[in-house]
Amino acid sequence: MEYSFQKMRWFLVIAIIILITEPLISFGIIEVKAVDNAKTDGLTSNSRATTNQSSLNSTFDGINHVIILVMENKGYPQVIGSSDAPYQNELAKKYASASKYYGVFPESLPNYLSIISGYPYLTKDKDPGTIAPLKEQTIVNLLQSKNMTWKGYFEDIPGVCHLTDAGKSGYIVHHNPFVYFDIRTDDRCKNIVPLDDFYRDLGNGTLPNFSFVVPSNIHNSHDSTVADGDKWLSSFVPRIINSSTFNSTALFVVYDEGQKHDKSGFGSGTYAVNGGRLPLILVSPFAKAGFVTTNEYTHYNLLSTIEAMLGLGNLGKGDTISQPMMDLMRSKS
């Protein structure tokens, strides 16, 4: 009887606490912090909460230019270790790479969207003219808030901010994530330009803080072989390495998704990934030479890394629960 009375007393105490605190929570007098959803989203090991900000600042100090170069539809084993990709393997051996890097969806567009926004807002490859522009934030908003510059460079795009395909193997609009957001409705659209502008900006020393580079469907290995894409990279990447800008640059060579070649992934929930295991190579004087990380990373980690490199903050999506890929960076002496 005494035990039952004590248990009832505790139930009464708990009930009183709930009755008192619930109105206070509702009116914002008591703040309740959300539980970190990294575990439920299957990305516990990538939790950004473990990253020390001062360590980030020190590691990425000196990087003023970040370039993302997106290739197409090839899985990790098709490129890394393959005799069809001698140049990419040369880069991986000289700089830093990831052996467990994954796309987030088995179609192109969601992966491109995720790289610049932290979320695959569209799960099918659609033309932007068929949908209203997305009003969600992207890395462009973060860059603007810091008065930093950006451009999207697209090979064979017929003109600035072009919204339709230009031939089967030329410029493909769903490889251009910027035009799916409200960026296309204002003067920011002028920053979506032909690849020739990249060569000019690089030569003039006027490369923006953030560059997003997409080759044509012939040169990105989508409608061609791994060897064809590797040959194009062997002519493009040296221009960057041999430029005066390279000393303050981080270039990421990455593929969008593995398509039928590799459908592997990991995790569950909102930010699950199933876009296949992909090559990712960091080409930079800041890269840890010859290093291969075995940590599991995704396009969300890539976005998180860009944000950390440029001191941008985050977008509150997949980037927020995904740590920067600091292990690819060499330690400051």
Predicted feature locations:
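Secretory targeting signatures
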Residues: 1-39
